[in-house]
């Protein structure tokens, strides 16, 4: 998936109030960007990092610029806009770039399901096959090439795992899909040191038939695509 129009370059001054970030452009202008990420963004928002932002043509937006990518001072590319996780996953499924999720004839988004009335990110269907329910999570937390999720305690994420276990118990296919949007990550684990309950539920979910997939995106200032399956350790 290519960025169109092309992203613009800046240097991060600070992120604040969760949804805002101040940057300085190469020609010395200071801008305030919308930050589309509610997480802790650990390691993704260090002052002095190079950032890339998009600009909306919607004149009604208070902050028309959106923070899309960070390039850390170590050189790693990180996609901080969490909306891209679902976009890239959908593109990869439709292109059959994810072998485990190929062979379906229908893809639906945001389908209500489960006792807790969640909305599943994607549901795949095909004749003579169980429906496949897919919950997508964006992974940007990295420590020494190890990717982790979540980067903060997530009761919502815990709820999603419970719902997926119920789906699997009903004989349908249930998948938790970790879209790794950090170029330095080479393997994935749940962040037990941050949210022990989530890590426990993920292990329980696997035991109850929920499939766990982690795929890494190739990221550049020109575009992104999910390409590579990563090993998962619980």
Swiss-Prot record:
InterPro entries: SfsA (IPR005224), SfsA_C (IPR040452), SfsA_N (IPR041465). One of its GO terms (molecular function) is DNA binding. Pfam families: SfsA, SfsA_N. Residues 201-220 bind DNA. Keywords: DNA-binding. Gene3D superfamilies: 2.40.50.580, 3.40.1350.60. The keyword DNA-binding applies. The keyword Nucleotidyltransferase does not apply. Binds to DNA non-specifically. Could be a regulatory factor involved in maltose metabolism. Belongs to the SfsA family. This is Sugar fermentation stimulation protein A.
């Amino acid at each position: 998936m290519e960025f169109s129009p092309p992203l613009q370059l800046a240097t991060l001054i600070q992120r604040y109030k969760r949804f805002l970030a101040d940057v300085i452009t190469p020609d010395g202008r200071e801008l305030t960007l919308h930050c589309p990420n509610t997480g802790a963004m650990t390691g993704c928002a260090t002052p002095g990092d190079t950032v890339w932002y998009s600009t909306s043509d919607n004149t009604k937006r208070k902050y028309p610029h959106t923070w899309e990518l960070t390039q850390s001072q170590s050189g790693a590319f990180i996609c901080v806009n969490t909306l891209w996780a679902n976009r890239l996953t959908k593109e990869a499924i439709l292109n059959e770039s994810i072998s485990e999720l190929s062979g379906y004839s229908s893809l639906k988004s945001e389908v209500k399901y489960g006792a807790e009335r969640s909305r599943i990110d994607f549901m795949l269907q095909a004749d003579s096959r169980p429906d496949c329910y897919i919950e997508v999570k964006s992974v940007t937390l990295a420590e020494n090439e190890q990717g982790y999720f979540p980067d903060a305690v997530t009761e919502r994420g815990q709820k999603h795992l419970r719902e997926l276990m119920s789906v699997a118990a009903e004989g349908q296919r249930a998948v938790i899909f970790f879209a790794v949007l950090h170029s330095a990550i080479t393997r994935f684990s749940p962040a037990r040191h941050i949210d022990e309950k989530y890590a426990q539920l993920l292990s329980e979910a696997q035991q109850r038939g929920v499939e766990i997939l982690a795929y890494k995106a190739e990221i550049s200032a020109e575009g992104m695509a999910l390409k590579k399956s990563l090993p998962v350790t619980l």
